[in-house]
């Protein structure tokens, strides 16, 4: 049963009306889609003594236990565990539903059979990147692909992209959400869009040629890869005139990288570009976007789509929902998905200021927004630089600090063990490609002062590279995602670490 949606009024409803409609949609979704056809949640609800009748409001979600990524991973006892989260409809049960019988009478059995196939049969898949665990596949039906286009098209709408404008999608071609989301964004809003497949498909030079030939107004990419594309084009003294909006995703987008990208665009002949950061994750089959803002302006937060799902913010320690405007962990529940479905999914991502329902200061839309920085819990690591104690390093903030420092074009953090001994102390090497006219000695001093003052880190080595060598180190155009943080520490059971890049000798500075 398809849940009624509000594609035209989705951004004009007040908080009370939106929450009431979400509560009704949640009840119907559980009753008609999830509990009849999800092996995992049918068993979970039975075990907890719950039914769809226990859920009539967003607040009722507290009755439902969280789903975590670990719940989706295969086990020796259940190697196909992920499929327990995929909706597997019973054809006989569907055929007996009064709504289906009525549709068959009005439209004919063959047409309704085709409609049910399109709604329920998986035909597409994306997967998690496998950064922290093995990749987890998420199945889509044609119904889900329609929702994918609906959500992606809202990025085009919020960005104010006109039908006569052109987009170039530089996201890497892979079964990952970012590439396909922006692929369907152009289709949904009938906007011309070229998907290059990123650096691994066409190479950095190939992407530059595509931009030169198409002369787009909108570029869509990961920030690090886009920086390298623009920086190389600037080295070659090319012109990318007419760029208006940069849509960024897949990585953090701190103020420093916004400013560097805008400065490169101006150098290439496109002053005044505005930037839209997006936030999404595979498990949501969805991504949200900011309004376009100029570098230096405070981003207004990510516009959520309340007709497609519920975003809760919880205290990560207690699991309790927090008030609006308070930070916490992001939890996701869909309202209209088929294929793979997860309820109350704990993302491990923390929103600095949680959800606000105040009208957006940029566009005036009244739907909820995620406000402030978003950080991944898994990016907080314990490192042992001394014999006596460890140091907790928040790599979320460390990456932002490096991106925000003037004089740095690109960088890579390399984690190693002293003497390649897995039982020895941790070491940090910082690889840097300078930008601008900051003297190397001054840049080194600034880096050491900043890292020690803010993070209690003293890099073992700071190594300076040319932009081309740093591109090779980050595997630009080789890896699906540029490598900004590389952990080469050997496991205690393994031999010495390897895998370093063969580069021209860098200009090295030691503490």
Model-identified regions with their sequence ranges:
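Nucleotide 5′-phosphate-binding alpha/beta core
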Residues: 1-127, 133-150, 158, 426-431, ...
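Active-site phosphate/ATP/adenylate-binding loop shared across adenylate-forming ligases
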Residues: 3-11, 68-276, 284, 288-294, ...
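Detector for glycine-centered tight turns/loop "hinges" at secondary-structure junctions
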Residues: 133, 237, 318-319, 480
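Short hydrophobic segments within beta-strands
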Residues: 170, 248-249, 431-433, 483
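Generic structural signal for residues in well-ordered beta-strands
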Residues: 193, 275, 311, 411-413, ...
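Conserved beta-strand termini and adjacent loop/short-helix elements that scaffold enzyme active sites
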Residues: 196, 278, 314, 416, ...
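AMP-binding/adenylate-forming catalytic core of the ANL superfamily
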Residues: 219, 331-455, 460, 480
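Conserved AMP-binding/adenylate-forming
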Residues: 253-359
